[in-house]
């Protein structure tokens, strides 16, 4: 599929990137992180290792991996951004845009990104279902409110692009469908 971009989403799906930078294995209260026995978290393994694995074993020949979608709190450290750049990866995620009828304010619209030292982290245009469902604790129908965000950020002027970002596990709850 020529219009599909292959991305890495890391090796263990860390929730706290600052902990990975320190070699600390931590998980969010809700889980969300793989914990291989004996694994010591490493930015190189999470970023470069996962990218190399996809390039060598999963991607079609000639199809590059050029994107890292940050996991968890999507708050990489400056060093994580530097490693990503050296690996030839663009990066994106975070930002927490959730403007809706509940939060009808431009203050609920995240910026385009944030500068960390010499690096720039591009934020996702609109957040995934986790933000709308309180980190997948409910209400599980919460992601339907993303339509309110699309409307809020699109009129009277488009201030954010539209993207649909969700995890396939959200189909495990009837309310989320």
Please describe what each predicted stretch is.
Residues 1-75, 79, 87, 94-104, ...:
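Metal-dependent polysaccharide deacetylase catalytic core of the NodB/CE4 family, i.e.
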Residues 37-44, 48, 52-60, 65, ...:
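Catalytic grooves of carbohydrate-active enzymes
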Residues 79, 92, 112-115:
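Flexible, glycine-rich surface segments
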Residues 103-119, 141-153:
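Alpha-helical scaffolding within the catalytic cores
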